[in-house]
């Protein structure tokens, strides 16, 4: 595994800047990988799926350290608004969820009271012990075959809009195969 400094440099380059969320995300992912015994996530990239629970700076850092990407189907996003990630070892079936403790912010303030919030958190998050920053929990994650990297499933066509649907994401409603948008789950509306 790379050093904290190396991962912070890579993460800042990918994300566009270094911030407290990047430091926390790098530390969170390093802990998750250590717990699973994955030392080289690049060499073992097909062994890991990571579920992230927030769409903030932390997630970019987790993706860099764990070498997981949405486009490789190894990074899964659950919009729960939590600074947490679950690391699933596909080889062993083991999974660990690592979540930032809310008390870590106060620990950072106490460690560096002379610094502004952002600078204090960056510095403290790089130095505080894992047990002060994070809760970890061994969990069980059932990953359906269609969510695995490399899955090659059937492609179907929506009976209403005619768009293709991959990875068993279709909905059957009143006997018709529909995409989620046409089935009423759209996140957008036509701009008339």
Regions found by a protein language model. Give the residues of each.
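Short, hydrophobic/aliphatic alpha-helical segments
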Residues: 1-14, 161
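Short cysteine-rich clusters marking metal-coordination/redox-active sites
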Residues: 158-162, 179-182
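Short Cys/His-rich Zn2+-coordinating modules
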Residues: 134-146, 160-165
């Amino acid at each position: 595994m790379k050093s904290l400094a190396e991962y912070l440099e890579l993460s800042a380059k990918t994300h566009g800047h270094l911030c407290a969320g990047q430091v926390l995300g790098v530390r969170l992912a390093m802990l998750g990988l250590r717990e699973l015994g994955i030392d080289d996530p690049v060499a073992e990239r097909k062994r890991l799926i990571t579920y992230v629970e927030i769409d903030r700076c932390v997630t970019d850092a987790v993706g860099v350290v764990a070498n997981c990407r949405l486009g490789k189907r190894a990074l899964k996003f659950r919009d729960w608004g939590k600074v947490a990630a679950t690391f699933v070892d596909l080889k062993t079936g083991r999974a660990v969820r690592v979540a930032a403790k809310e008390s870590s912010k106060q620990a950072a303030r106490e460690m560096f009271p002379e610094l502004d919030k952002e600078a204090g958190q960056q510095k403290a998050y790089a130095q505080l012990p894992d047990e002060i920053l994070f809760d970890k929990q061994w969990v069980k994650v059932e990953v359906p075959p269609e969510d695995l990297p490399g899955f090659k499933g059937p492609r179907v066509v929506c009976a209403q809009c005619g768009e293709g649907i991959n990875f068993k994401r279709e909905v059957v409603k009143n006997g018709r195969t529909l995409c989620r948008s046409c089935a009423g789950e759209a996140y957008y509306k036509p701009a008339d």
